[in-house]
Regions:
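Histidine-centered copper-binding motifs that mark active-site loops
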Residues: 2-15, 22-324, 330-331, 361-448, ...
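N-terminal pre-domain segments of enzymes
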Residues: 44-54, 58, 461, 466-469, ...
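Predominantly extracellular/luminal regions of secreted and cell-surface proteins
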Residues: 58-63, 227-239, 513-539
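Active-site pocket scaffolds in enzymes
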Residues: 69-71, 114, 120-129, 303-318, ...
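Surface-exposed, short loops/turns at beta-strand junctions within beta-sandwich domains
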Residues: 146, 334-336, 621
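Short, aromatic- and glycine-rich surface loops/edge beta-strands on solvent-exposed regions
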Residues: 150-156, 339-347, 625-629
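Conserved "landmark" site that anchors the functional core of diverse proteins
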Residues: 274-279, 321-326, 492-494, 501-507, ...
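Conserved small-residue hotspots that stabilize compact domain segments
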Residues: 302-303, 327, 331, 335-358
Length: 646
């Protein structure tokens, strides 16, 4: 194994005093962790960057690590002694092996986010493999069939929150179509010294536990002055009836989170060097558990060239929002011999992550003030004058029977909350749908999925000229949403919001990226129109902190079944007041944003409040695949399904 910045058997831990091990009193505990003496101390403010490992064969060790990001001692879950873990660099066309050894006292796992691979290598305990028991080693064997910016993380309980995350860069086998002089990974995450089990318990008992910006009497009179007393009272009563607050932007906030950039708190000021005139590629990865970040580099425009590992037509912006688990690659080109701040503020404006681009180490730039804290509106609850579709007008269809023998897909998933009390809905495959057999079907026997769109990729199936790929179909599953214990509200109106940058970003005077801007650089590889539609409502009860699809938590829901080779449209309707980043394992999600053959391929899609989003899926890889909200505590509160491709 070739290891950049790190010799074999040594860990890379250039840490600052903000991240030191717990002094001489902790010496026994440190020795017990058996890091081979590889511990470092540095001066306050010294930055650290994860190691980079490149090649075909990798050895990763998962263990506990004493850390101090905040001035308080805590314990992280580290990979090779680092939080985040080492940057892994793979190459398209190679077959890589990753031997993961678990030195924790509990089971662990690594999921390779958005990597197309055999289902038994996906790393989801209880679904695709048993997990990695304490003291054991599991070897992942992955044929690499794509390129781009990705990441990896644990799929075991809350280990992602405690630091088991890292960047994964897959280099294109051919010459990269993106022109740049140097590159940096910018890995964002949200750190807390609080035990995640405690956070989850707090949210279950009081969903706004971490909301320190509740409405006050002055807020009410300010709203009344803006829109009149009667509308202000009406809105106030509406929020009260729903047991919600317009200030509840993020479930977990800077009240407990410290926002890190490449493992550095803001004071540590991670710095990337450049020479004026260079084209710098910044690979942004949101590896946080619960935080949407709004990214800008004051003084520089950013040209977005890749989204979720797939090339897009360049679009120049001042700012973009990155949801949990999303990745964006941008090009910046500073011309002056000066420093620039990389500024990442969470949606609720409760803190920030910060780094610097500079010609020399030690240079800094001004940190901009945070934007005003946004507030939800009745529009976010589907109660504004939006001219959207009423819930009663949504198409429905008859119920299909689920295929028996799928108990594995409903078992408890790595400690997930599996309580339930609502009726069952089942999404099943139509055995008469158009499929492709024998063409690129990926499984563990050696066949591969459809290729990723690229400069040398030809569509496997030509685009249909006679069918409208975005025409509405009758959903193959019945959806009748009613207010109840697991569904606190149902929007009167929903709409497409692809041109909306998101709450807190409209009208801020900056050019902000939207999903409507994303146009794939290369034509999609599967031109067939979908033959059926699966409609899913994102539902929840904020007060009880229950989340799910179609009013159901994971334990009460049958798997969504797809026939191998079929092409399906997923329609997501957000009935809640929060954004949800929805991630389907194992398969690409082709976002229907109006670009037809050039709709962008994504792996994680943000669905805004009261929004309807649709995307196409080619079921080209068999297996049991996780499908869930990537807000970690939402997933564990029930917003999880299994998709079975067979």
């Amino acid at each position: 194994m070739h290891e950049e910045k790190q010799g074999k058997g040594r860990c890379f831990l250039p840490i600052s005093r903000r991240r030191f091990v717990q002094g001489l009193a902790a010496g026994g505990a440190v020795a017990a962790l058996d890091w081979g003496g590889c511990l470092a101390f540095g001066e306050t403010g010294q930055q650290q960057t994860p190691a980079t490992l490149a090649g075909k064969n990798f050895e990763l060790t998962i263990d506990s690590l004493p850390v101090n990001f905040t001035g308080r001692h805590s314990v992280a879950t580290a990979v090779n002694g680092s939080v985040p873990g080492p940057i892994l660099r793979w190459r398209e066309g190679d077959t890589v092996t990753v031997a993961v050894t678990n030195r924790l006292k509990v089971p662990t796992s690594i999921h390779w986010h958005a990597i197309r691979l055999p289902a038994d290598m996906d790393g989801v305990p209880g679904l695709s493999f048993p997990g990695i028991a304490p003291g054991k080693t599991f070897v992942y064997r992955i044929p690499v069939v794509q390129s781009g910016t990705y990441w990896y993380h644990s799929h075991s309980r809350f280990q992602e929150q405690t630091g088991l995350v890292g960047a994964l860069i897959v280099e294109r086998r051919e010459k990269d179509s993106i022109d740049f002089d140097r590159e940096y990974v910018v890995f964002l995450c949200d750190w807390t010294d609080t035990n995640p089990e405690t956070i989850f318990s707090n949210l279950k008992q009081q969903s706004d536990y971490y909301n320190y910006h509740k409405l006050t009497v002055p807020n009410f009179f300010s709203e009344a002055k803006k829109k009149g007393l009667r509308p202000a009272i009406s809105d106030h009563l509406a929020w009260a009836r729903m047991n919600m607050s317009p200030t509840d932007i993020s479930d977990v906030s800077g009240a407990t989170y410290t926002y890190l950039l490449n493992g550095n708190a803001p004071a540590a000021n991670w710095t990337g060097l450049f020479q004026p005139g260079e084209r710098i590629r910044l690979r942004f990865i949101n590896g946080s558990s619960m935080t949407f970040f709004d990214i800008r580099v004051p003084g520089l425009q950013m040209t977005v060239v890749q989204a979720d590992g797939n090339d897009v037509e360049p679009v120049t912006v001042d700012e973009f929002r990155i949801g949990i688990a999303e990745t964006y690659d941008v090009i910046v080109q500073p011309q002056d011999d000066t420093a620039y701040t990389i500024f990442a503020q969470p949606e609720d404006r409760s803190g920030y992550a910060r780094g610097t681009l500079a010609p020399k180490m030690g240079m800094t730039a001004a940190v901009p003030p945070m934007d005003p804290r946004p507030m939800r509106t009745m529009v976010d609850m589907g109660m504004g004058n939006m001219g959207g579709m009423k819930m009663g007008d949504m198409p429905t269809s008859s119920k299909n029977a689920a295929t028996p023998g799928m108990n594995m897909a409903r078992q408890s998933m790595a400690g997930m909350d599996t309580g339930s009390d609502s009726a069952e809905h089942r999404e099943t495959g139509d055995q008469n749908q158009q499929t492709i057999t024998g063409m690129g079907m990926g499984n563990s026997t050696g066949r591969t999925p459809f290729p990723q769109p690229g400069p040398s990729t030809m569509p496997i199936m030509p685009v249909s000229r006679t069918a409208n790929a975005e025409a509405k179909l009758k959903p193959s599953n019945p959806v009748h949403m009613h207010v109840g214990p697991q569904v606190v509200s149902v929007p009167m109106q929903v709409r497409e919001r692809l041109n909306d940058p998101g709450d807190g970003l409209s009208g801020n005077g900056r050019r902000v990226l939207t999903y409507a801007d994303l146009r794939a650089r290369y034509r999609g590889v599967d031109g067939r129109p979908p033959t059926r539609e699966i409609e899913l409502h994102l539902s929840g009860n904020m007060e009880r902190y229950i989340w799910g699809f179609n009013g159901q938590k994971f334990s009460s829901a049958e798997p969504i079944e797809l026939k191998l080779g079929e092409r399906v449209r997923f329609v997501l309707i957000n009935d809640t007041m929060m954004e949800h980043p929805i991630h389907l394992h194992g398969l690409w999600s082709e976002l229907e944003n109006g670009h037809g053959e050039f709709n962008p391929y994504k792996h994680t899609i943000i669905v805004k409040p009261a929004e309807r989003v649709s995307y196409l899926v080619s079921a080209d890889t068999p297996g049991h695949w996780a499908y869930h909200c990537h807000l970690l505590y939402h997933m564990h509160a029930g917003m999880f399904r299994t998709v079975v491709v067979s």
